[in-house]
Regions:
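Secretory targeting and sorting signals
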Residues: 1-31
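Generic detector of short, well-ordered, non-transmembrane alpha-helical segments enriched
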Residues: 25-27, 68, 224, 307
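Chitinase-like catalytic core of GlcNAc-active glycosidases
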Residues: 34-230, 234-261, 269-275, 281-296, ...
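Beta-sheet entry/capping signal
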Residues: 115, 310-311
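A structural signal for short secondary-structure junctions
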Residues: 268-270, 305-306
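Short, low-complexity, polybasic intrinsically disordered segments
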Residues: 289-310
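Residues that scaffold, gate, or flank divalent-cation-dependent active/transport sites
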Residues: 315
Length: 351
């Protein structure tokens, strides 16, 4: 996702058999007490729209309350410069992984029964070698960053948004998956609960070959992945798209791809592993790729029927009708809508 730039895959391979760790795909299922937000698993269906960390004019807790979205995906974490092994929110050195950076807002969201899903990468990081796995060549150092995020904010899941140049960085892909496996082993040893998800670009037919290779490497490295989240927008195919049909066919394609990677998994497990991220209104391509208010209702019902585990969208700050006809706006959807329309529709999916 532009400057945007978002228990499966992570299956453990034993011999020639990949065993899928889904559902409670957690490292350390006995983790914690009920008083620790990290000890609470994510609900069976999660709605977690992206919050743009570079636009904090309205705080996390406030937008969560206004929109009704109990879970937020936080975009993004990245290094300040290539070669660094230190991650910051939006790559801003004044915003380290520390309680002083958004800790109070996250605690408020957790006290209300929700949580946040921090996301690494995104389009900007992935095109500037500042995604942590592209920037840092030490797998233990990458894992330590993941562990710090878990212990600092008590999060239930970490998302890894891999796009653009990062999809071709095979060394970075392998480091990332090794670091996931290392973090999961650390979590199990410390009786902590954690999940990892991948957010990947898609065609209407499913993952690109590069996206599929990311998951194949996860299996090889023994990394457990709880969700694969498809970016079902910005196709740039040059034709008018049926965004509902494209979402459904992309998910069908991913299902087939996952089944080939994880033949031991049930259909229900595979569908529950699939996540969908829409871009409400007019996306970056333009009016030919418009996700309408009616589309949102259709997708929410379809996702419930299919057993989809996650719905998200880009991004919470856009969930208003302030700029009808504008494509790819960062603060409004480009279509006429009531404030928080898409959030309310997709929150019903989660409930």
């Amino acid at each position: 996702m532009k400057r945007r730039k978002a228990t499966l895959l992570a299956a453990l391979a034993a011999g020639t058999t990949a065993l899928l760790a889904l559902g409670a795909a957690t490292a350390g299922a006995s983790a914690g007490t009920g008083h620790d937000p990290a000890s609470r698993p994510l609900p069976d269906r999660v709605f977690a729209p992206y919050y743009e960390m570079y636009d904090t004019s309205t705080g996390l807790a406030s937008l969560s309350q206004q929109s009704g979205a109990r879970y937020l995906s936080l975009a993004f974490l990245q290094t300040a410069a290539p070669g660094s092994c230190t991650a910051y929110w939006d790559g801003d050195t004044s915003q380290p992984i520390a309680p002083s950076s958004y800790g109070s807002d996250i605690a408020v969201i957790q006290a209300r029964g929700g949580n946040v899903i921090p996301s690494f990468g995104g389009y900007t990081a992935d095109t500037t070698s500042t995604d942590i796995a592209d920037s840092c060549t030490s797998v233990p150092a990458i894992a330590q960053v993941y562990e710090s995020l878990i212990t600092t904010y008590s999060v239930p899941r970490i998302d890894l948004d891999v796009e653009a140049d990062s999809l071709a960085n095979t060394a970075g892909i392998d480091r990332r998956n090794q670091a996931i496996a290392m973090t999961e082993a650390w979590a199990a040893a410390h009786h902590r609960r954690i999940e990892f998800s991948y957010t990947l670009p898609t065609f209407p037919s499913g993952l690109t070959s590069a996206g599929y290779a990311v998951l194949r490497n996860a299996v090889a490295d023994g990394a457990r992945i709880a969700a694969v989240n498809l970016l079902t927008f910005d196709y740039y195919l040059g034709t008018q798209q049926d965004m509902v049909a494209d979402t459904e066919s992309a998910a069908d394609g991913l299902f087939t791809q996952l089944r080939s990677l994880y033949p031991a998994a049930t259909a229900r497990q595979l569908w529950h592993t699939i996540g969908i991220t829409e871009m409400p209104g007019i996306d970056d391509f333009g009016p030919d790729e418009t996700f309408s208010t009616a589309d949102a209702v259709t997708i929410a019902h379809w996702a419930q029927r299919q057993g989809i585990g996650l719905i998200s969208f880009w991004a919470l700050q856009r969930d208003n009708g302030g700029c009808p006809g504008t494509k790819g706006a960062g603060t409004c959807s480009g279509v006429s809508q009531p404030d928080w329309y898409f959030s309310h529709v997709f929150e019903h999916f989660a409930n």
